[in-house]
Amino acid sequence: MAAKDVKFSTDARDRLLRGVDILANAVKVTLGPKGRNVVLDKSYGAPRITKDGVSVAKEIELKDKFENMGAQMVKEVASKSADVAGDGTTTATVLAQAIVREGVKSVAAGMNPMDLKRGIDLAVLAVVEDVKKRSKKIKTSAEVAQVGTISANGDEEVGKIIATAMEKVGNEGVITVEEAKGLDTELDVVEGMQFDRGYLSPYFVTNAEKMVADLENPYILLHEKKLSGLQALLPVLEAVVQSSRPLLIIAEDVEGEALATLVVNKLRGGLKVAAVKAPGFGDRRKAMLEDIAILTGGQVISEDLGIKLENVTIDMLGTAKKVTITKEETTLVDGAGDKKDIEARCSQIRANIEDTSSDYDREKLQERLAKLAGGVAVIKVGGATETEVKEKKDRVDDAMHATRAAVEEGVVAGGGVALLHAIRSLDSVKGANPDQNVGIEIVRRALQAPVRQIAENAGVDGAVVAGKLLENSDTDFGYNAQTGIYENLVTAGVIDPTKVVRAALQGAASIAGLLITTEAMVAEIPEKKDAMPSPDMGGMGGMGGMGF
């Protein structure tokens, strides 16, 4: 086992604080509408330019093991804020730095670290309650656009695109962000259910020019296993032919004789038909087939449920207004399923999302929920260079999460003002002893940090701005760094999601409390590697007679 180095009390906390400062100083330059960019070196390709706090934090790894521990703890604050609310990572970092800095000073002055932490926790509870009280619910699409614009660092185009996307697919819908090929940022909305399986044979195509199969008002047969012969299906196929409506078969696979028979019937014009593979794999495939069945008002033909192919009747088939199948994907629009059944299925998936601990499962469940509930929107981010596209994509991602959070818990005045005015809620909070009161004071001072930093980044004195705002009793009154004007920020459209503000403060206080109460640190001593010995030049002696 390698030897360890141990640091105690003040020495340990000073090292931690140094690491916290290095990381926080790199992150906080990005805060606010006039925040600057940070350039991140990549081991391959062009450097990455970003204004996203968490991306900067993730890149930082310090040489000194003890300083690195402090930096990694604050990195945790940024990541947690990104996980919970999707934004507010820079605010969380600035708050954590402010609390740690004041806390370390107080501990050095002889206060009890545990009482300081308790005081900090008391203050945070009071502030969170106060912020929640002032939260306003979002009602209009314009307000959604404002949140998106602020979170994308004042980019109105991004705000509008996100608002349109949320209007189209609803709050449950999935919005994904991709890189576009061109210069423009555009929005693609897929209404209805789409899954990534295309037609099994190009002979099913109805529009040869576009190579798509369009089925109007088709019956939909959902089969869990492979179809290799159609003998068992003949009664139901005849019923479909008589109804003169098209048929879509979704099964694990359609092969051999079954596929050949369907193709021949399609070419002869006897039966308008198309076949696609079922989406997903294993248990997820079963669940997705069940989703499609509920959406289209049909039944999954499965031997687990005791339904055999030969017993299938036409009323077991689902229907939809229109189905479009390309080489890669299938879209079902306007399924005939019962609204109550669809809502019940959505509630069930929501419950599963709450219960799961796996990020991958959660993502897949959210996709399923979106396909059932609303649809899928894809924002394609364009730009002149790859570096610009990546930077913009980061901002769009942040903005998307922020708007989601805003719809969930409402909004408060932006620009760090919500936290600044929450200072007043601490007047009535008293700790059990003087040290806890100091903890409350630490939070009181830290709550000014975001406003000050936004002002500093805009080239104005932060202390002057914070002082001027605290003189005003209107809790929405703030400094608009974009225009340099003091005004009512909610009216000016400078708003932050309540969830983002709350998560930033709670995350920052949690980690800062742990850092303040640190009394010893243990890290591995890096082993000095000996320089490589020079190679032996023996054996070269026989070169004497070379006659140079």
Curated annotation (Swiss-Prot):
- GO MF term list: ATP binding; ATP-dependent protein folding chaperone; isomerase activity; unfolded protein binding
The record, for Pfam families, names: Cpn60_TCP1
Q: Where is this region: Disordered?
A: 529-548
**From which domain of life does this come?**
Bacteria
Q: What are the cysteine partners in each disulfide bond?
A: none
| Subcellular localization, as worded in the UniProt entry | Cytoplasm
Gly residues bias locations: 538-548
Key words of the record? ATP-binding, Chaperone, Cytoplasm, Isomerase, Nucleotide-binding
| PROSITE patterns linked to this entry | CHAPERONINS_CPN60
One GO BP: protein refolding
Binding residues for ATP: 30-33, 51, 87-91, 415, 496
* Presence of keyword Glycoprotein: no
Signal peptide bounds: none
Query: How does the record describe its quaternary structure?
Result: Forms a cylinder of 14 subunits composed of two heptameric rings stacked back-to-back. Interacts with the co-chaperonin GroES.
Which NCBIfam families does the record match to this protein?
A: GroEL (TIGR02348), PRK00013.1 (NF000592), PRK12849.1 (NF009487), PRK12850.1 (NF009488), PRK12851.1 (NF009489)
User: Main role?
Assistant: Together with its co-chaperonin GroES, plays an essential role in assisting protein folding. The GroEL-GroES system forms a nano-cage that allows encapsulation of the non-native substrate proteins and provides a physical environment optimized to promote and accelerate protein folding.
What is this protein's name? Answer: Chaperonin GroEL 2
Organism (species): Rhodospirillum rubrum (strain ATCC 11170 / ATH 1.1.1 / DSM 467 / LMG 4362 / NCIMB 8255 / S1)
Designated gene of the protein: groEL2
